Design a protein with these regions (language model features):
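Two-component/phosphorelay signaling modules centered on CheY-like receiver
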Residues: 12-31
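CheY-like receiver
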Residues: 122-164
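C-terminal output helix
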Residues: 108-117
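The feature encodes the CheY-like receiver
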Residues: 58-59, 88, 107
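Receiver (REC) domain active-site loop signature in two-component systems and cognate sites
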Residues: 57, 69
């Protein structure tokens, strides 16, 4: 399986560096943004699987990026984890309503974040494997549809002989 790409969107230099280093150590490809506009540009141009995003960033907040993302026509929309110091119930609700998939308050426990990302990565990789299997089945059905009944019968005979 290919390593997933994680976008870290954080304006605070130290926080961003810690998250970037962690993402790379955990075995994921890294994309990085210093503000919401840069995050949006990366989301438009790169295939991002998971996005770890601060709420309060210059030029465009994490919540604004979430709203834009959910309203966009992107082929691939990433799993979004908002990481923020906003810890009031109404903030958490607003984050989810904006389109965040997950919400973690600062200070961020890296062990917890790693577990969340690993869980999401596992789910995404299983979904991708299922999609690939479905595509393979569809290609096989198209191939079979182009065969004559005699070709299908002979193919079935060959398969039965292999099993015995």
């Amino acid at each position: 399986m290919k390593a997933l790409t994680v976008l870290v969107a954080e304006d605070d230099l130290l926080s961003r560096m810690v998250l970037e280093r962690s993402v790379v150590q955990w075995g994921y490809h890294l994309a990085s943004a210093v503000d919401g506009v840069a995050a949006r540009e990366l989301l438009e141009t790169r295939s991002i699987d998971i996005c770890i995003m601060d709420w309060e960033m210059p030029r465009m907040s994490g919540v604004e990026v979430c709203k834009w993302l959910r309203g966009s026509n992107l082929k691939n929309t990433p799993y979004v984890i908002l990481v923020t110091s906003k810890d009031q119930p109404e903030d958490i609700q607003a984050g989810y309503e904006a389109g965040a998939d997950d919400y973690i308050t600062k200070p961020c426990d890296l062990k917890y974040l790693r577990r969340r990302i690993a869980t999401v990565a596992d789910k995404l990789q299983r979904q991708n494997a299922c999609l690939e299997h479905a595509r393979s089945q569809e290609r096989a059905e198209i191939t079979i549809a182009g065969l004559s009944p005699l070709d299908i019968y002979l193919s079935d005979l060959r398969l039965m002989r292999r099993k015995t």
